[in-house]
Amino acid sequence: MKKVLIVDDSLFMRQSIKSTLMNSGKYIIVGEAATGDQGIELSLDLQPDIITMDNILPDMLGIDIIKELRKEEVMAKIIMVSAVGQESIIQECRASGADDYLVKPFSNESLIERIDKLALELN
């Protein structure tokens, strides 16, 4: 099973993603972070396979977290999960190292489909 870290300032969103992934029986949630600093620290400490990340956090933007993680050579697959759906933002996130981008709101099926795709790329 692949290890997943959830980075989102919304407790509801973290719980929703966690529940969806755990109920799939395919993923282990190794940690949750509500800020960018926590997300970076946990990514370095826990070495997750996949990171779900909100793009707008209280202390920094998800895109800046991605840049920091890639600079630190964290090779986890990163899926941005954000209410911001502007194509220019999506492209900027991908150019900075995001592997996928899912716009909120989304269905549980869409989340699992995207995470499954990233997990396959790890094999």
Regions found by a protein language model. Give the residues of each.
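Two-component/phosphorelay signaling modules centered on CheY-like receiver
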Residues: 11-31
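Acidic catalytic/metal-coordinating carboxylates
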Residues: 35-38, 61-64
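Active-site beta3 strand of CheY-like receiver
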Residues: 46-52, 57
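The feature encodes the CheY-like receiver
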Residues: 58, 86
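Short amphipathic alpha-helix used as the core "switch/output" element in two-component signaling
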Residues: 63-74
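C-terminal output helix
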Residues: 88, 106-115
